[in-house]
Every structure is written in C-alpha cells, then in structure tokens.
Amino acid sequence: AAAASAVGVDNTTVIGTTTTTSALVHGLKQPVIAASANVAAAAAFPNSIFNFSDADGASVTLPDSGDGSQIGKSYEFITTVTATSNAHQISLTDDSNEKFIGNLMRIDTDSSDAISADPALIGDGFVEILMNGSTQGGIKGSYIKCTNIAVDLWFVEGTILCSGTVASAFN
C-alpha cells in the first residue's frame, strides 16, 4: 500500500493518496510576509499572507502563471496600515496575457457603510489592483485573495474598505 504521508525527492510533502477522502493536519499555519516595501515576483511566496503595513504604500507582483506552475496557488493580502501616500498595489507580472477575474466588495466607511460590487470580467483585461487608501479602498482592514485557476488567469475575491466617492480598484 502507498504511504499515507511522505516527502518526495523534490521536497514535496504528500499527505494521503488520490483516494483519501479526509485528512487532518494539525499545526498548519500560513506565513505572514511584511509588504512594507515592494515585493518582486520571485519573493512572492504562494499560500502566504502579505501584510500591507506601511503608509507609504507597497506593490506586490504575483509570479507569471503562463507556464501553469502557479495553478492552485493563492496569495492573500491584508491591510493593517492605510496608505496615505502612493498606494497598496497587487500586480500581474505579464500584463499582456495574464488577467484578473472575480469580484471585490467595496464598503464605503464614511456613508452608512454602503456596499457595492467591483467586478472584474474576463473582457475587462485588468492586470492590477490599486488601493489608494480612500476612494479605491485599502483602508486598514481590507482583505483580498488572489488564486491562480488556469494559465494566465487569476481569480480575485475580497472586501475592501473605502471612503469618499468609491471607485474601482481594478486597472
């Protein structure tokens, strides 16, 4: 019988088999990476939480997904310090082929917490999310998750906190 848990020669830990229907993994946690300065694609580790923690803003560039090696990998972003200059930004490496699809819920924090949708459709061709700390979101408490679901295609979900006349965070 195949081993239920093993470490392969490529340093991949395998838990269960293709017929496993349930697995408990105790003590599993995600790394939290400070995004207090720009983070290049090579330093954007998958299944991590990036903490936008600098009022000067920062940019995290997601790795190129064109070769299929990113499929199934997710990147999460939480704003703990509102950007007051520049912006908190999430960008795709290949802005010619890669695209964001999905939806960000916007909560307008200065007008009875009105909620609106900020959809990203495939035809929109969005390649970055720009949170300016006010109208485009990125106020402390904003959350975004980006998951590569296919070659050159990233699914976005989250809730961003905005103020003023809210505008799309997608570019």
Where are these regions (language model features)?
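A general structural signal for short secondary-structure junctions and capping/turn motifs
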Residues: 4-6, 16, 67, 134-137, ...
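Structured beta-strand segments within beta-sheet-rich domains
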Residues: 116-142
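Exposed extracellular interaction/assembly regions and N-terminal maturation sites
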Residues: 26-119, 147-171
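Extracellular disulfide-bonded cysteine-rich modules/repeats
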Residues: 11-14, 140-148
